[in-house]
């Protein structure tokens, strides 16, 4: 069984599965049965942490498509898994309801129905919309926790000031921000804040949208429909070429540890922080199992220090973050790096 970690009160496997790609974001999706089987196999090898969102599926299918798949795959083992999902809140729908709480609850009820459950373990605000008070969302999440409808809540793509204010209203279980060897911005403030305040940190795109696996090359053709990689600046040909030194570092350590590049990139962040639980995404069962296997790749302190020093000596070219951000102020933090 895989080692466990804590996201505040939630006990999860050290690595989770990002389920988005089964419905959204990385081009053509597998057959439904394949996706369901892949999630069940991940559970069988010890993964209990599955990440989805109400919006996944909206481009090719419909919002909720991914939650339905996760529900079909895992409702038979519901009590043994930790399900994380996310909501977006628009100002007009908040205005149409009597309160932020009512608006949040109506999203939650719809997600629970699709997931085939009567509670969600970890409910994230997917993006902060500056026209909707996040303080009121935080208070609403507290009420939902009190009612037993969610076990914990979180924020995604959040900066440290917003996080601290939200945490003061209702303690946050986990932050889900972009974090990988190519996107280390959260090391400055957000992750240290989370470590200090017993908040879990769940990196999304931990393999840098596949780049760190070494399998994406300048010849890789991204798909026409619903493939986020077409818009990820780090995956422009010039950046793929310029970031090769990072792949060389990974390749050295992969050889040393008899592991894959993707596994080393995950083992690195697990070693670095005790509260980090990455959710790599893949629509391919073998790769899902490979990524979960990174929990067994243990770096010694010395190996980690060498890896860290080698990474710090590399310049990262291009970034990904801003394409993931809708709110103005936090979005500008990423844009400055262009
Ligand atoms: N909170 C947010 O705003 C947010 C944003 C984005 C994502 N997420 C969540 O985070 C999860 C992970 O993020 P992500 O999918 O964007 O990025 P990721 O995990 O860094 O990368 C996914 C890409 O890498 C490839 N890949 C994965 N493992 C591989 C391996 N071992 N070898 C070779 N290629 C591999 C996948 O291809 P194949 O599918 O072909 O294997 C896919 O193209 C998502 O599933 C989603 O749940 C959250």
Short names for language-model regions:
Residues 1-81, 334-338:
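N-terminal binding-site loop/beta-alpha segment at the start of enzyme catalytic domains
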Residues 2, 225-256, 271, 275, ...:
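Terminal-tail/helix-coil boundary detector
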Residues 10-15, 46-48, 77-81, 117-121, ...:
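Short, well-ordered coil/turn segments that N-cap beta-strands
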Residues 17, 35, 42, 50, ...:
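Conserved, mostly hydrophobic/aromatic
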Residues 18, 53, 84-86, 123-126, ...:
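A cross-family glycoside hydrolase active-site/sugar-binding cleft signature
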Residues 21-26, 56-58, 90-96, 287-290:
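A short acidic, helix-capping loop that chelates divalent metal ions and anchors anionic groups
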Residues 90-185, 189, 199:
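Glycine/proline-rich, positively charged
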Residues 186-225, 260:
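Aromatic-lined glycan-binding groove of carbohydrate-active enzymes
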């Amino acid at each position: 069984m895989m080692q466990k970690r804590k996201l505040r009160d939630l006990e999860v496997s050290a690595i989770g599965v990002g389920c988005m790609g089964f419905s959204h974001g990385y081009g053509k999706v597998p057959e439904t049965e394949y996706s369901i089987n892949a999630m069940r196999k991940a559970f069988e090898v010890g993964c209990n942490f599955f990440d989805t969102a109400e919006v996944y599926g909206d481009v090719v299918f419909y919002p909720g498509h991914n939650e339905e798949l996760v529900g079909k795959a895992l409702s038979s083992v519901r009590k043994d898994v930790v399900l994380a999902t996310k909501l977006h809140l628009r100002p007009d729908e908040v205005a149409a309801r009597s309160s932020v709480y009512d608006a949040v609850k109506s999203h939650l009820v719809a997600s629970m129905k699709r997931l085939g459950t009567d509670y969600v373990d970890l409910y994230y605000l997917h993006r902060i919309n500056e026209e909707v008070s996040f303080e009121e969302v935080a208070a609403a999440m507290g009420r939902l926790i009190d009612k037993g409808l969610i076990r914990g809540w979180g924020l995604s793509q959040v900066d440290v000031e917003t996080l601290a204010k939200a945490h003061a209203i209702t303690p946050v279980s986990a932050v889900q921000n972009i974090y990988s060897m190519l996107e280390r911005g959260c090391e400055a403030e957000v992750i240290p804040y989370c470590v200090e305040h017993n908040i879990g940190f769940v990196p999304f795109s931990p393999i840098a949208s596949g780049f760190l696996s070494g399998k994406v090359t300048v010849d890789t053709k991204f798909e026409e429909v619903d493939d986020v990689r077409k818009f990820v600046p780090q995956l422009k040909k010039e950046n793929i070429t310029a970031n090769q030194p990072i792949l060389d570092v990974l390749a050295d350590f992969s050889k040393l540890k008899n592991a894959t590049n993707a596994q080393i990139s995950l083992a690195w962040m697990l070693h670095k922080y005790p509260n980090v639980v990455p959710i790599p995404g893949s629509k391919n069962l073998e790769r899902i199992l490979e990524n979960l296997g990174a929990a067994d790749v243990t770096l010694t302190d010395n190996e980690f220090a060498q890896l860290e020093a080698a990474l710090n000596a590399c310049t990262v070219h291009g970034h990904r973050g801003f394409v993931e951000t809708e709110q103005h102020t936090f979005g500008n933090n990423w844009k400055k790096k262009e």
